[in-house]
Structure formats: C-alpha cells, structure tokens
C-alpha cells in the first residue's frame, strides 16, 4: 500500500521492522520526513537494534566512559547519550505535529504517559521527572526518549527496556547523568515476548496520540 493513501489525519500506520542497523533506520526516518507532505500518513516503526551507543545533538563525549567495541553514532535527535541493543523495544514516531495540533511538550507527555499506562497495566509503579525525560521505576530508568522536529514533523522516538543486557549502560553516563541506574521489565519479574509489549504499547500510544484509525503495514520491510 502506498504511503500517500486518501485517508484522514486520524489514520496511523504501524510497522514492525524487526532487527535493523541503527544507521539504516536513521537514514530511512530522515528520508521519510523529507519526502512527506500533507497527504502522507503518520507512522510508528517498531524496531530492535544491534548494540550501539548514540549521541544526540547535546551529546558530550565525556559521557562515553568505556565504549569498548560497541559502535558510537552521533545523530540528530535531542538529548545526550544512550544505548540501544537486543531486547529493547524501540518505537520511532513519524508524526505531522502541525496536522495533529501537537506541541513538542504535548508529544513528550503523550509518549511518557503511554509507557506509564503500559506499566500500570502490569501493576508496576512508575515516576516521571521534569528535568530528566523518560519513565522510571524504583528510581531506575526503564524508558528513554529523544526527538527531532523538522518542518513541523517529528522523527526519532522512544525506547523501552524489556529483557536486555543492561551492562553497556554502565559504560556511559545514561542521558548525561553520572550514576544513573537502569532497569528492564525482566528484572521486575515480567518475562514478556517483545511482540506482546509492542502490541500493548501501540494501543496506548494510539490512544494518547488521539488516532482513531490505526492499521498495520508491511512487516519486517524497510521503508524505501
């Protein structure tokens, strides 16, 4: 199905792209955003990445303490340094903010609250911090976000730690904070298939972002 389908602003395509190199998806997000116009349907891209550290626009190399053989990519999202790896569920948010009448702060709230909704459904208590975007459990970060807005449209997105090797986080200062601890769902006693987490979080994202007509696009197919 072509991305320029004649539908309303409440339509959202959801794709599962599987395991993909970070650079490949980053370039695809930029290309999608450059090419999109008023007829382009908004999309969510679910993805996993092989191990990689990413430095955002505000990223300082002093927060890369011992990267070892894990590659480092300097990218154009907001924020500092983070880690992506297998067992982490990442959703990229490709949304026309002007069309949805959303400000960046409203978008950040919607993304964080979607994770809060999900974790509350698992009976996990959460917190948010005004000075450190993301979602925290027992004082440890479980979800991070970083966005870029270009001509009123956003890309990049949100990552949720599901069942992963957390040790690379301790080779950096996560999000620029020395000593910040992280956690995942598995360590909270929730051993869930990644696909189930993605499906459930998609439902909360759709609700918080105000879409009424979500549908699933091509599985495991990179955008051209």
Curated annotation (Swiss-Prot):
Which subcellular locations apply to this protein? Answer: Cytoplasm
Q: Which residues bind substrate?
A: 77-84, 144-146, 157-159
Q: Where is this site: Lowers pKa of active site Cys?
A: 141
Pathway involvement of the protein, from the record: Protein modification; protein lipoylation via endogenous pathway; protein N(6)-(lipoyl)lysine from octanoyl-[acyl-carrier-protein]: step 1/2
Any one GO MF term held by the record is: lipoyl(octanoyl) transferase activity
- Can you supply one Gene Ontology CC term for this chain's record? cytoplasm
Q: What is its EC number?
A: 2.3.1.181
The record, for PROSITE patterns, names: BPL_LPL_CATALYTIC, LIPB
InterPro entries recorded: aa-tRNA-synth_II/BPL/LPL, BPL_LPL_catalytic, Octanoyltransferase, Octanoyltransferase_CS
Residues annotated as the enzyme's active site: 175
Q: Which UniProt keywords apply?
A: Acyltransferase, Cytoplasm, Transferase
| Taxonomic superkingdom | Bacteria
Which reaction does this enzyme catalyse, per its entry?
A: octanoyl-[ACP] + L-lysyl-[protein] = N(6)-octanoyl-L-lysyl-[protein] + holo-[ACP] + H(+)
Name the SUPFAM superfamilies for this protein. Answer: Class II aaRS and biotin synthetases
Question: Which Pfam families does the record cross-reference, listed alphabetically?
Answer: LplA-B_cat
Biological process (GO), any one: protein modification process
Task: Give the free-text miscellaneous remark of the entry.
Answer: In the reaction, the free carboxyl group of octanoic acid is attached via an amide linkage to the epsilon-amino group of a specific lysine residue of lipoyl domains of lipoate-dependent enzymes.
- Name the NCBIfam families on file: lipB, PRK14342.1
HAMAP family named in the record: LipB
Protein role: Catalyzes the transfer of endogenously produced octanoic acid from octanoyl-acyl-carrier-protein onto the lipoyl domains of lipoate-dependent enzymes. Lipoyl-ACP can also act as a substrate although octanoyl-ACP is likely to be the physiological substrate.
> What's the protein called, per UniProt?
Octanoyltransferase
């Amino acid at each position: 199905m072509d991305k320029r389908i004649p539908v309303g602003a409440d339509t959202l395509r959801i794709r599962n792209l599987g395991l993909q190199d970070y650079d490949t998806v980053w370039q695809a997000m930029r290309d999608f955003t450059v090419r999109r116009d008023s007829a382009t349907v908004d999309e969510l891209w679910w993805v996993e990445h092989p191990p990689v550290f990413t430095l955002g626009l505000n990223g300082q190399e002093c927060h890369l303490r011992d990267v070892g053989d894990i590659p480092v990519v300097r990218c154009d999202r907001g924020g500092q340094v983070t880690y992506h790896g297998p067992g982490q569920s990442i959703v990229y948010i490709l949304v026309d903010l002007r069309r949805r009448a959303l400000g960046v702060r409203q978008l950040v709230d919607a993304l964080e609250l979607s994770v809060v909704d999900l974790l509350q459904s698992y009976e996990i208590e959460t917190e948010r911090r005004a000075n450190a975007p993301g979602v925290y459990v027992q004082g440890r970060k479980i979800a991070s976000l970083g966005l870029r807005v270009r001509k009123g449209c956003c890309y990049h997105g949100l990552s949720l730690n599901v069942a992963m090797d957390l040790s690379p986080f301790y080779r950096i200062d996560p999000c620029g904070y020395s000593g910040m601890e992280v956690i995942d769902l598995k360590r909270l006693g929730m051993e869930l298939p990644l696909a189930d987490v993605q499906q459930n979080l998609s439902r909360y994202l759709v609700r918080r972002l105000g879409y009424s007509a979500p549908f699933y696009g091509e599985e495991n197919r990179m955008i051209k």
